[in-house]
Every structure is written in structure tokens, then in C-alpha cells.
């Protein structure tokens, strides 16, 4: 039996420049606020009142730690955060992997939620994110989340280990609903 996939009203846009690439499917491609975010894959299947008010975004975060402090992971690896849109609620489902220079690895899965009201200073986490550690050969065992009221962004932090070089990669699957 063959699997057949049909895509109705498919819109594909690709922008390739340094540290920026996105492919957008569906009506989310008409949402101009997406242009400010980097490295996203957006999926939508219609909308309630405006393009992009009900959609899913998938993006990658990365960073590098050298000690036991919290290291923020960014869209571009250095300083680009995922800024939440006004009057929108979010559910995030994240996969994180860390690999130390000696080959030891940590793998984690995290679920949580956030929302933003009418301005950047109204952003908040919804409850406490649930962290599931699948394997931790490094001995770090944690990722943390916070929000920035200065720009209304969701912040992702990996907790490193003293005197250990670790590269971090996070894949975030983010459902967003605006009203």
C-alpha cells in the first residue's frame, strides 16, 4: 500500500542568507511578523481571523557552555531570541541534546507553556515546564526557561558542568494561538 500526501493551497517561501532560513506552509506565509524571527519552519492550516493566528513553528537553538552556570541558547547561537507575539498563548515541546568534548552526552525532553498579553512586559510562563531526562552521561541534568519582559521573548537555558566544554542543540516545536 502506498502513502499518498496531498497538499491543498500550498505556499512555499524560502529565504536563504547567513543565519536566516525559513520555509512557510499555508496561511502563515501571509503573517508579516514572522519576518523578524530566524530559522523557522512554520505550518498553518487556515486561520480564525488573521493569517498566523493559529499555527505551529519549529526552530533550532544552539549554544556552548564551559562551566556550571546557565547558558542561554539562541536562534543564531549568539543573541537572537524567539520574541512572542502580542495577545498569544504558546505550548512548547522541546528536545535538547548536549555533547561534551569527551563524547559524553545528555538528552532531555521538555514541555511547557507561555503567554504574552498586549505588550512585552506582560509575558509569562504558564506553570512549571516539565523536564524529562532521557540520558545524562555528563551529569548536568537540567534546562531552564524564563521570559524577558524587556522584549517579550521566551528564553531557553542549558545548565553546564564545571570545567566541561559542552555544545548544546535544542529543537523547539511551538504551537501558538492568538485571540
Please describe what each predicted stretch is.
Residues 109-114, 170-172:
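Extended low-complexity, serine/threonine- and proline-enriched intrinsically disordered segments
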Residues 1-4, 113-117:
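Assembly/interface hotspot detector across virion components, adhesins/toxins, and nucleic-acid enzymes
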Residues 90-95, 170-173:
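Internal, hydrophobic beta-strand segments that form the core of beta-sheet-rich folds
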Residues 2-4, 9-82, 170-173:
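Periodic small-residue-enriched repeat registers in elongated scaffold domains
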Residues 175-177:
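Short, low-complexity, Pro/Ser/Thr/Gly-rich segments in the mature regions of secreted, periplasmic
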Residues 32-33, 49-90, 97-107, 119-126, ...:
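Surface-exposed ligand/attachment interfaces on beta-rich extracellular proteins
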